[in-house]
């Protein structure tokens, strides 16, 4: 099992627009110091799951059929804006496991395109996704959202 952090920034990201602090100045000078919107990739056996889809370049990063699906914690823009581009793909279906949130981000549920929101997580529900065990834990974050707890062979982590 391998976890790759693709984006660790909050809604502001780093560098923060207009900020002149040392960290933001350094991030402007060195791309490696930038913090992109939330997203991670978990690879387990022959499966690849995206945890949150905050990156806007998902269609360039992940060729068609390269993801097993998406584990979405909630639908704030900084965690889900990549879905807005991804949904317009063709020739495949990508399962999105996350909380039921038809009011979530813009009109994603109304116009899902290739995204399949048909299996939302319930609080404390555990699912087996191949060798990966995933549990949705409720969390209040301006509205009720989910924290994803993932386990592989006895090891666990919260995202």
Predicted features, each with a name:
Residues 1-158:
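Binuclear metal-dependent hydrolase catalytic cores
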